[in-house]
Amino acid sequence: FDYNIAYEIRLQDALENDMLCPFVYFGVKDIEIDGKLIDEKSNISNLTSDERVKHILNKIDFYGVCNNQVRGLIFCSSKAEARELSIKLNQHGKRTIALTGDDDINYREKIVKQLEDGELEYILTVDIFNEGIDIPSVNQVVMLRNTQSSIIFVQQLGRGLRKHKSKDYVTIIDFIGNYKNNYLIPIALFGDKSMNKDNYRRELREPNILSGLTTVNFEEVAKEQIFKSITNTVLSNMKILKDAYTDLENKLGRTPMLIDHLTFDNIDPIVFFNNNSFKNYADVINKFSNKSIELTDTESNWLSFITFELLPGKRKHELLLLQELIKNGEVSKDKFIEILETEQLSTKDSIISSVENVLSLQFLKSQEVKKFGTEPLVTLEKNVYKLNSEVLDCFKNSDFALLFNDVIEAGLYKTNDYPEIFTIGQKYSRRDVCKLLNWSKDEPPLNIGGYKIDKNTNTCPIFITYHKDDEISDTIKYEDELLNETTLKWFSKNKRTLDSPDVKTIINSPENGLDLKLFIIKDDAEGGDFYYLGDLTIVPST
């Protein structure tokens, strides 16, 4: 259709539109052999052991089906596993048969009819039912294999989603082992292609009712296996990025821009820049597309700066100012404040000063100055903001102009994730926090450590790594603990007493108005960004 998408619908949307049969998904723990969970390297004898067969039988009988007659598909990792498991399940009274690509089409159709007629309870297979063959009466789908791709996962799950008068819902039982690809499960179930680890963790933690009767449930151990896979997988590796880029490029029939990845629910564009190969989107296009974008070093540098500083969209102010400057060349400070008021954003002097610091590059710490230089992107003269003349010259290059505007548009789109300057449940780096608390200069993480008081803004962010690495020094292995949903037991830095100036300032925060904000990360493996949990007040007499 000349690259106009005629119709595309995600699993969740199809369920909401009553186009598919609802399903109840159970992610269950696979068995352990000699204390180790089944994984990609498990041999056929372990996959078909009597212990595993009993485990499978226990789960498929426990979770059952919506009526008394099972019509199930069991997806296995190999033909040998399918055949051997079929034999063993039959020995336990089940009526099953293995079907593989080796069987001719007439035989397959005969076996499918036996399942539909109730002569069989289960067909075991590897991938011949991924697509193309529908058995509307299937009411249970069992997955005994590693998830190879989110597309295949949905195809296999979908074998049971055709509506049929004999069923109200389909039971999906997914046996989750110690698989590297477990991170694909939330991508498939929730239709989330963002490659944003925090999104996936959030989706797994929250109660999941996709639509109507459709629910997603995980045994705790199975859920932990997925969390582990999410943590250990580099979602910004070149193959994942290339697949995401080319998938959208093929869909659109043109070069996708950053904003396209967002509006078409593709990869979160931030993930491209988690890969050190890419400093700006021109690098991405030149790597993955046949199109060639030529930028001067100056153009590339400015594009890299706004990508680094503004694309995450954690504060709208800078983006709005740049958007106005691109339109009109200059804007008065009064006009900028008027724009902020229209957007219902704060116009405090401290925030305006912080915005000016960021766009003049004064906020950068020394290592970033080496990368981006000291030339301001925006200047303020006689209460009028102007774009650097060097940047204005760059706009003569249409590719630069397109890419620069794209960063602004994508950054503004991403600000929707941050309705407040600090949004509870969202993640922030120490650098983000310094900027959003309006500190005049970014502080190196080592200077901040677990907390730092900024006298100019009267603020003190507190950063806690909840599970400490065993290898860190005992002197900084603080025993911070959340006692309940509203109370934190917190330790000051090492070698402090109640008379230490920073401790006294924190204790006296109810009187001195010190703004205490809490940021927590589970452990160092989750990266350098912390979840914002809210403001802190001192519990009296503690």
Placement of each model-derived feature along the sequence:
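Charge-dense, extended regions
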Residues: 341-460, 468
